[in-house]
């Protein structure tokens, strides 16, 4: 039980340190040269996701990262830029997350799909030429689970994870890199690879519970189109 408490403390400490780092990034962006007039973009995004959950203790059948559930995400994006190399990007959308347990030897193949409404608030740093630029995004993200679905055959070796999740609210950090092309008349076309890590656990992690931690990791490839409205 002492090991479980240590792992929880480490996870929380990492979360605090990352949030502090994001605050420093945001503070640094405010010190950048300002534009004569702020730029405002509004658009939509969509793409594919791959996700898993890091259970402690581990769940059998989840060690093959090539056998993770594939889902999708989509939503709206708003970007406000008052500086030459950075902006604030806020999104609101839907995302599928979850995990898969698979074993050809034992004959089970189970998938839990969790449907979330997510809201990332990101510092957007861009660099490059006038029409084609690279960028990276970093910031906190909150999400709320609106639906949980199960499919496939369950295993018998470990069954605690088949309970309904205890925590519908999730929070974590998101970071991404990508490229975008911008044209005054055609708008902005953006391609991004993003990773999200949840600091919140799906299940209760007190001393009396089975799991010391149950944190999600989600990767996504997204395409976005934005129109400059100002």
Go through each PLM region and give its residues.
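Cleavable N-terminal export/targeting peptides
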Residues: 1-38, 228-230
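Gram-negative (and chloroplast) outer-membrane scaffold detector with strong preference
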Residues: 32, 36-40, 48-54, 79-153, ...
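Short sequence motifs at beta-strands and strand-loop junctions characteristic
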Residues: 36, 66-71, 111-116, 165-171, ...
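Surface-exposed strand-loop-strand hairpins of Gram-negative outer-membrane beta-barrel proteins
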Residues: 49-74
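Extracellular loop and loop/strand-boundary signature of outer-membrane beta-barrel proteins
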Residues: 60-65, 104-110, 157-165, 206-212
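Short, hydrophobic/amphipathic alpha-helical packing segments
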Residues: 71-75, 120, 174
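Predominantly the C-terminal beta-signal and adjacent terminal strand-loop region
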Residues: 164-170, 175, 179-230
């Amino acid at each position: 039980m002492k090991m479980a408490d240590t792992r929880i403390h480490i996870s929380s400490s990492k979360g605090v340190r990352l949030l502090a780092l994001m605050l420093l990034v945001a503070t640094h962006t405010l010190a950048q040269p300002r534009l004569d007039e702020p730029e405002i973009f509004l658009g939509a995004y969509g793409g594919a996701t791959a996700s898993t959950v890091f259970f402690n203790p581990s769940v059998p059948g989840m060690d093959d990262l090539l056998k993770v559930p594939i889902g999708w995400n989509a939503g709206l994006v708003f970007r406000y830029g008052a500086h030459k190399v950075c902006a604030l990007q806020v999104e609101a959308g839907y995302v599928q997350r979850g995990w898969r347990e698979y074993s050809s030897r034992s004959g089970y193949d189970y998938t839990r799909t969790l449907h979330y409404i997510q809201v990332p608030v990101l510092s957007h740093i861009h660099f490059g030429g006038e029409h084609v630029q690279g960028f990276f995004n970093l910031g906190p993200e909150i999400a709320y689970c609106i639906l949980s679905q199960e499919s496939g055959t369950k295993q018998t070796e470990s069954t605690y994870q088949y309970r309904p999740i205890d925590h519908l609210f999730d929070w974590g950090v998101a970071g991404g890199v990508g490229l975008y092309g911008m044209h005054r008349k055609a708008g902005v076309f953006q391609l991004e690879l993003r990773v999200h890590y949840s600091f919140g656990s799906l299940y209760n992690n007190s001393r009396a519970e089975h799991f010391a931690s149950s944190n999600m990791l989600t990767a996504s490839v997204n395409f976005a189109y934005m129109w400059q409205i100002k």
